[in-house]
């Protein structure tokens, strides 16, 4: 008996999706049920010291933070402040998580992928516990993921994005950058995509210009607001400290030859297991200087740039080594005090009441703020939820490889989401350190790129196999 395999049909030009959406409706319903179960399985949203409380405090007293946290996420929290409920924040973010899955699905259907393929590409965002747990926490990750995915969908909805679509994508990426500054360079990648994608050079320049202007204006306004409060035209005051911490895993001052002022930031014998630990450890050389660590941001940046210029291969080696932690078959703790997993834990997580900011936020944002506890019997059901780590780590590496192969074979539809995924994965590691949390924004773009890579790779395989039809014995 023989089955005939005809060449796959081209899927380059976006069009109306073929077939119904019944399968994805079932998938979305299951994903929503999982999130309802999470809301029942935990008695409140997860609050982390000190990130969550800094975000909530900034939402009450709107001002740009001088350190790691720009004000994009606090604006979202400010909009929900009248309800005085961190549980509502979690519910809204669960809705965003579902929305991200929907965006992936509709974009891929628009690109003529079958319903099962588009639903499969959306599945990691909808069912990976790492995403769902972040949605249930007062952290900025879910908002960043939603904004970046929305920008991708807007830019790729048509084969040649209009100037209006490009401007909308620029705004979305700007707000993503104001939520997490690592997303700011995506504006440049998107503008380059529009410039190369559109047919006539005048239309291409107009589209890229619209995206660049729409992306730059919110950043410039924010930088001016930041300057009013901190006397410096910038988006944050922590970039130098972060990059200095990155260099502490390889810096050799006998090679770097720092200036007398920079020499105070040389490694002092403290050996920590992750670059990010040097930011907070009181024994690290930066933290032994007088004043607040972030008051030395410019000095830290100058040292870090000098170190990278003197030891570029050591720097690249550390970035590659830490980035590879994203693809492991089993979870690797980094730093050792953090235990990554794709499970829903049971237990209680009390708040550090010794910090005055906890009581201040409770008084000003939500009087019912408390440490999160699991609730039975729902927590036991969640604890039994099966999602092996390799579907989170190793599969992500496979998706990136598939997207990279597709970008090489047919770059037009695949290159933008693949470049977004690679940048979102590598940039945080290059700027500070690897964190399992920071991998998540790259996964939706990687799913889109991998899904779009399949048709051109199948066509390439068919051409290599030979013209006409291929007969397979089954």
Language-model-detected regions and their locations in the chain:
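Extracytoplasmic catalytic/substrate-binding loops of multi-pass membrane glycan-assembly enzymes
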Residues: 41-56, 64-87, 235, 296, ...
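Multi-pass, polyprenyl lipid-linked donor-dependent membrane glycosyltransferases
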Residues: 50, 89-99, 120-155, 162-164, ...
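Membrane-proximal stem/loop segments at transmembrane-domain junctions that anchor or position
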Residues: 235-364
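Membrane-interface anchor segments at the N-terminal boundary of transmembrane helices
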Residues: 18-21, 87-88, 317-418
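Transmembrane alpha-helices of multi-pass, membrane-embedded glycan-processing enzymes
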Residues: 77-84, 89-103, 144-147, 390-400, ...
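Transmembrane signal-anchor helices characteristic of membrane glycosylation enzymes that use polyprenol
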Residues: 20-46, 127, 214-225
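Membrane-interface transmembrane helices that cradle and orient dolichyl/undecaprenyl
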Residues: 111, 151-166, 195-198
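Start-transfer (signal-anchor) and selected internal transmembrane alpha helices
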Residues: 1-36, 207, 456-457, 461-474
